[in-house]
Swiss-Prot record:
It comes from Homo sapiens. Residues 235-237 bind DNA. Glycans are attached at residues 33, 93, 106, 127, 186, 271. Residues 369-394 are annotated as: RCL. InterPro entries: Serpin_CS, Serpin_dom, Serpin_fam, Serpin_sf, Serpin_sf_1, Serpin_sf_2. GO terms for cellular component: azurophil granule lumen; blood microparticle; collagen-containing extracellular matrix; extracellular exosome; extracellular region; extracellular space; nucleus; platelet alpha granule lumen. This is Alpha-1-antichymotrypsin. It comes from the Eukaryota. Keywords: Acute phase, Glycoprotein, Protease inhibitor, Secreted, Serine protease inhibitor, Signal. Residues 381-389 are annotated as: O-glycosylated at one site. Residues 1-23 form the signal peptide. PROSITE patterns: SERPIN. The gene is SERPINA3.
Length: 423
């Protein structure tokens, strides 16, 4: 079963992620608790999802950085968590518990039914595009033609995750790969073209989740102001990059002296924004070590509008492919990858195990807007006159970018830019 994520376009251009879960051979949900009319519980579970999503995002980020500390990072925690939650529909016993705990859900406070309800509500909320902001998220199952799925699983997959199902001939691996990749390509508006590179003929099912986001900056950068400038990879090493700029504006700003970093927020039109975190020289590791849900909350709560004389941000396009198996093992999701896996909620028999979880993300940041898997908006206004004491913010060294909705603590995309020229 595989799930593909559409891309999200953001103020700069950001693109999207696609995680996929491949299954090879090897708890009942309470309908009443999952009704769309359950508004009171909806607020509770939505907050629970956002909190777990942030915790999962930072835990995953730290593992990705450990593997490649000097590389760019780009991923959609929400896309990955949705794909794994989708998989958990068919999991039982230890396999189920490991997946949900790995996603950072507190199972003593939130039931399995509430977790799926929160994803159901999120999907309904996301799939509401407007002229200002295009945002959609989807799920799909690619199932071996001879595999018989339980009615309960297919019904829950459709009702909770809006999942489409496609009969797939995995014996013809080239055709199966094309079918899946074409689905992802269409869902991400062409941003993700080769999510699946290798497909075993023994594959029984592929789960795909996709998220697409497209938005414009409330205050776009003027292309005529973009110029070549230095981006410092270290104190003594730099590369020349196209540097965008804004002048004389008022934006949410916070100087975090405790963590030696500067935080600014740039808004998109619509309900989305991007947080940019700029550590002081040689302070990136200290900031990364303190990436916690409470840190993000403190940053967002501490933002105050401030007059900025000049803001410089590189124009860039980065993409990364990840095989998440080892990282998910580090996060406690182990049994699903072994012969002990209990995914009997899918077929009724314990004959499936996860062989691979792959994820691809693309982020494009440019003058007019962003295309990516998530977005949040922050208002930027021009000053009527030059300020006497000018604050200048230069993103000319490694920085972090987090794309968030303005009304929740969810994280749609998270990126670390160590080298804008490193595609």
């Amino acid at each position: 079963m595989e799930r593909m994520l559409p891309l999200l376009a953001l103020g700069l251009l950001a693109a999207g992620f696609c995680p996929a879960v491949l299954c090879h051979p090897n708890s009942p949900l309470d309908e009443e608790n999952l009704t769309q009319e359950n508004q009171d519980r909806g607020t509770h579970v939505d907050l629970g999802l956002a909190s777990a999503n942030v915790d999962f995002a930072f835990s995953l980020y730290k593992q990705l950085v450990l593997k490649a500390p000097d590389k760019n990072v780009i991923f959609s925690p929400l896309s990955i968590s949705t794909a794994l939650a989708f998989l958990s529909l068919g999991a039982h016993n230890t396999t189920l518990t490991e997946i949900l705990k790995g996603l950072k859900f507190n199972l003593t406070e939130t039931s399995e039914a509430e977790i799926h309800q929160s994803f159901q509500h999120l999907l309904r909320t996301l799939n509401q595009s407007s002229d200002e902001l295009q945002l959609s998220m989807g799920n799909a199952m690619f199932v071996k033609e001879q595999l018989s799925l339980l009615d309960r699983f297919t019904e829950d997959a459709k009702r909770l995750y809006g999942s489409e199902a496609f009969a797939t001939d995995f014996q013809d691996s080239a055709a199966a790969k094309k079918l899946i990749n074409d689905y992802v390509k269409n869902g991400t508006r062409g941003k993700i073209t080769d999510l699946i590179k290798d497909l075993d003929s023994q594959t029984m099912m592929v789960l795909v989740n996709y998220i697409f986001f497209k938005a414009k900056w409330e205050m776009p950068f003027d292309p005529q102001d973009t110029h070549q400038s230095r981006f410092y990879l270290s104190k003594k090493k730099w590369v020349m990059v196209p540097m965008m700029s804004l002048h004389h504006l008022t934006i949410p700003y916070f100087r975090d002296e405790e963590l030696s970093c500067t935080v600014v927020e740039l808004k998109y039109t619509g309900n989305a924004s991007a947080l940019f975190i700029l550590p002081d020289q040689d302070k990136m590791e200290e900031v990364e070590a303190m990436l916690l849900p409470e840190t993000l909350k403190r940053w967002r709560d501490s933002l105050e509008f401030r007059e900025i004389g000049e803001l410089y941000l590189p124009k860039f396009s980065i993409s990364r492919d990840y095989n998440l198996n080892d990282i998910l093992l580090q996060l406690g999701i182990e049994e699903a990858f072994t012969s002990k896996a209990d995914l009997s909620g899918i077929t009724g028999a314990r004959n499936l195990a996860v062989s691979q979880v792959v994820h691809k993300a693309v982020l494009d940041v440019f003058e007019e807007g962003t295309e990516a898997s998530a977005a949040t908006a922050v208002k930027i206004t021009l000053l009527s006159a030059l300020v006497e004491t000018r604050t200048i913010v230069r993103f000319n060294r490694p920085f972090l970018m987090i794309i968030v909705p303005t009304d929740t603590q969810n994280i749609f995309f998270m990126s670390k830019v160590t080298n804008p020229k490193q595609a």
